[in-house]
């Protein structure tokens, strides 16, 4: 267990039951250079390795619920072959090539498997705090739209569900989200949302902090940045457990998929991150539902030490509280 250096409280206030994952890949399109993900794909090809082509998605369907029509102006709904999904989850091929149906066309994508969980990864719950949860990790991938080196993709495959994000200048940020009604997948771009995802950050930044970070990134080339892997401890609240059908597996699947999206952004900046440990609240968690700052302080008190370099609390409880973090804290001790 390590001393607490930085605790970052995240309040994932998204329409979880309707629109799926947060659009966290939006930053990746702001570059004229190939992304690190694109360079990884290129290196894989240069080694004459083979992308396994799979036919996962079926043709588009006409189904779209009234609830969805109020949120999205246009989208694609398509079924997937669950046998193929299970095969990807079970076999975890090194590289995949598949097509995503979207608004009458097919987006051809290339994916490479990544390891987002630390070799010693374990998960625990409040129900049995000292007993590790039996968890089978998903198949986690990053990649690009074929021929588009500025695009970035993160897709996570599990036994009965996949989560995915595709980000590019041409399409915006596309989300692949399983519909609860019939199991088909809703595929839409954030450009076509009629409502914007709410999100508030309550972090108090020192004056000029953002500019200082930007200068640091600009002054240091991608190839010379530190290669140390940042280990991340993740804790989830009781409300998220309830939202995911009172299933620890569902919670960990969902949050590791979210982490894959976020870690892809960091990977494009040559920062490697992995999840070192996971903790699921399967009972009342005691964190504030009215103030993210209060919840952050409670989290610090409850977790004076943890297995990782950074700790995140991902919470659904509360009402659009947003997120909060301590800034400039990695070199300081807390607790």
Regions from the PLM with identified roles:
Residues 29-32, 48, 52-63, 184-332:
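Fold-level signature of zinc-dependent metallopeptidase catalytic domains
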């Amino acid at each position: 267990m390590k001393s607490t250096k930085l605790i970052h409280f995240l309040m994932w206030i998204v329409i979880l039951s309707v629109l799926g994952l947060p659009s966290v890949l939006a930053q990746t399109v702001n570059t004229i250079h190939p992304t690190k993900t694109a360079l990884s794909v290129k290196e894989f090809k240069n080694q004459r390795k083979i992308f396994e082509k799979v036919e996962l998605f079926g043709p588009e369907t006409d189904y779209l619920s009234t609830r969805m029509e109020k949120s999205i102006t246009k989208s694609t709904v398509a079924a997937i072959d669950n046998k193929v999904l299970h095969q990807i989850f079970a076999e975890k091929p090194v590289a995949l090539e598949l097509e995503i149906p979207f608004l009458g066309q097919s987006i051809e994508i290339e994916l490479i498997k990544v390891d987002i969980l630390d070799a010693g990864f374990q998960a625990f719950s409040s129900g049995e705090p000292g007993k590790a949860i039996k968890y089978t990790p998903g198949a986690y991938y990053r990649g690009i739209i074929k021929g588009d080196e500025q695009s970035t993709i993160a897709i996570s495959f599990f036994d009965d569900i996949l989560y995915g994000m595709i980000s590019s200048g041409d399409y915006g940020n596309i989300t692949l989200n399983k519909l609860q009604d019939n199991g088909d997948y809703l595929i839409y771009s954030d450009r076509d949302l009629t409502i914007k995802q709410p999100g508030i950050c309550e972090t108090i930044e020192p004056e000029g902090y953002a500019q200082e970070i930007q200068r640091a990134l600009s002054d240091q080339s991608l190839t010379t940045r530190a290669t140390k892997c940042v280990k991340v401890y993740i804790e989830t609240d009781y409300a998220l457990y309830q939202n995911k059908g009172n299933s620890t597996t569902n919670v960990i699947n969902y949050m590791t998929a979210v982490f894959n999206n976020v870690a892809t952004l960091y990977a494009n900046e040559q920062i490697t991150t992995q999840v070192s440990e996971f903790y699921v609240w399967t009972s009342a968690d005691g964190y504030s539902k009215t103030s993210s700052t209060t919840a952050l302080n409670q989290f610090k008190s409850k977790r004076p030490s943890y297995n990782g370099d950074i700790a995140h609390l991902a919470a659904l409880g509360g009402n659009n509280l947003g997120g909060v973090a301590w800034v400039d804290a990695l070199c300081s001790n807390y607790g």
